[in-house]
Design a protein with these regions (language model features):
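Solvent-exposed alpha-helical segments within well-ordered globular domains of core cellular machineries
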Residues: 6, 10-13, 22-25, 40-44, ...
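Intrinsically disordered, low-complexity and often Lys/Arg-enriched segments
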Residues: 1-10, 247-251
């Protein structure tokens, strides 16, 4: 590497221009071979830097989202679940519900694809550079109860309120103690008409009193979550079973 190239690389490092620092020499050589103008060369350098920063930003948001696994909507086999409205799911992935702070409720039996769809929507939001956090209902409640115990609940609630999309998975598998239910309601109520939330549940709404045993609190939770909500029913037949069966038939 020449002294001039080394100096440019050092300047790029100081300015945190990672892509330009690694690409300027090869792009300069290519520009010389193709007889490109200085402006063309500069544009290529800057475009590469922008694309690299966007890629790293999305990667960071995906990491911060704490997704259980990387399952995109492109991987979801809608043909195996024709009753799930593919067009509605793809429309949601465009992100309008995020701008309008509308809830999304995925309701269906275990194994029907709720978590996959929720994860896919979360990934789509990360690609749109939104701050996303994925959690199970049980894990979220445990965090809130612990925060209340060590007197850091206000800070915890502010942290969750700052996220542009929360995915609460597996609501309904276990009943919630009244204190836990009230804390979860605080998170949900704080987001009403302010920020989006996705909830997956195996229970129809008529059975939510099994989870929120306080009738008044149950009604309040349902009111917040169903107002202006996108409600997607994933059915009762296992998506995982049908997909596995389909793969075996192809073998």
């Amino acid at each position: 590497m020449s002294m001039q190239a080394a100096s440019i690389a050092q300047h790029c490092k100081s300015l945190r221009l990672a892509s330009i620092g690694t690409q300027f020499a090869s792009l300069a050589e290519e520009a010389g071979k193709q007889n490109h103008s200085h402006l063309h060369y500069l544009e290529a350098l800057l475009q590469g830097e922008v694309e690299d920063r966007e890629r790293r930003s999305i990667e960071l948001r995906l990491k911060d989202a704490h997704l259980p696994r990387m399952k995109t909507l492109e991987e979801f086999d809608f043909a195996q679940s024709p009753h799930i409205p593919a067009a509605r799911i793809r429309a949601l992935a465009e992100g309008g519900y995020l701008q309008r702070a509308e809830p999304v409720l995925l309701v269906g039996e275990p194994g029907t694809g709720k978590t996959h769809l929720a994860t896919g929507l979360a990934i789509a939001a990360c690609r749109q550079r939104k701050r996303v956090r994925f959690t199970t209902a049980a894990a979220l409640v445990n965090q809130l109860v612990e925060a209340q115990r060590d007197q850091s609940l206000t800070r915890m609630l502010k942290r969750w309120a700052s996220v542009e999309l929360i995915v609460i998975d597996e609501l309904g598998y276990v009943p919630l103690a009244e204190v836990a239910a009230e804390l979860l309601f605080q998170v949900i109520a704080e987001r009403a008409e302010k920020a989006a939330v996705i909830v997956t549940t195996n229970l129809p709404f008529s059975e939510w009193p099994q989870v929120f045993t306080n009738a008044r609190l149950c009604k309040a939770v349902l009111d917040r979550l169903t107002d202006q909500a996108h409600i997607i029913e994933t059915g009762a037949e296992s998506y995982r079973f049908r997909r596995t069966l389909g793969k075996k038939r192809k073998m």
